[in-house]
A protein has these predicted regions:
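Bacterial signal peptide processing site
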Residues: 24-26
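C-terminal motif of bacterial Sec signal peptides marking the signal peptidase cleavage site
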Residues: 19-22
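Repetitive helical segments and hydrophobic/amphipathic motifs
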Residues: 13-16
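Long beta-strand-rich cores associated with HINT superfamily self-processing modules
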Residues: 86-234
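Intrinsically disordered, low-complexity regions of eukaryotic proteins
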Residues: 28-29, 157
Length: 234
């Protein structure tokens, strides 16, 4: 009797083991398929960004020229950054709105006109997606548009020259602004280092353990922004 019971138990264990192995194999297979599909979607979305980036840049340059401004070089989000953003937000690559992006730079007094011009031009071209005025408790403010194409959105930001200086390190902003304008802004802000706005933001965003540290850099960020153009929206 005990021998029969032992054989029965062994059979049950073997069957259960086979079932668990099968389930694990199915789970792994589904996970692999999902990962492969994500990489395919990523490839496709980044390919569409290459297609929709140039017309986005053309619109930005067209508007910038009408207002004696500048358009920054077209920029594409890296694959690594795109994948990280998707996994963090649990989103599809096609849901990201800034795989291709550029910025229109202008004098502070021209910002409203530039915003109106971008919206009008994009609407006429049939690619206007949305407009958003952004603010934060760190003193940062800015404006962005999303151009809506068939398979993907792209992004156009609008910044004053001073706020572009505040957001980007010298190796990025000096070539775009040119030496003359860069030096004017450098003098006007009292010789402050460019790009500290983004630098402080990255510290605040990455430090999730210390409220005191985040508050310290938040105050630094607010003080830094006070040397540049104030938000034009009251």
């Amino acid at each position: 009797m005990m021998r029969k019971m032992g054989k029965w138990m062994l059979a049950v264990i073997l069957v259960c083991g086979i079932s668990l192995t099968s389930c694990n194999r199915d789970d792994n297979s589904a996970s692999e398929q999902a990962g492969q599909q994500f990489q395919k979607d990523l490839d496709q979305a980044m390919s569409w960004a290459q297609v929709y980036g140039p017309p986005t840049q053309s619109l930005a340059e067209e508007v910038a020229a009408r207002h004696k401004g500048k358009a920054t070089p077209l920029n594409y989000k890296t694959r690594e950054s795109t994948e990280r953003k998707c996994r963090t937000d649990k989103s599809s690559p096609f849901e990201l709105r800034d795989l291709a992006r550029t910025t229109v730079l202008c004098e502070y007094d021209s910002i409203r006109n530039v915003i109106e011009d971008i919206e009008k031009t994009a609407t006429t071209s049939g690619i206007f997606g949305r407009y958003k005025h952004q603010t934060s408790d760190r003193g940062y403010w800015g404006d962005l548009f999303n151009m809506k194409f068939e398979y993907l959105y792209t992004e156009i930001q609008v910044k004053s020259y001073g706020n572009y200086y505040a957001a980007n390190p010298e190796e990025i902003c000096r070539p775009v602004l040119g030496d003359s304008l860069y030096n004017v802004i450098y003098t006007a802000c009292g010789g402050l280092e460019p790009g500290l706005s983004h630098h402080y933001y990255e510290i605040i965003r990455s430090d999730t353990t210390s409220d005191a540290t985040r508050e310290y850099y938040k105050k630094l960020c607010i003080e830094y922004h006070s040397h540049f153009d104030p938000d034009f929206v009251e």
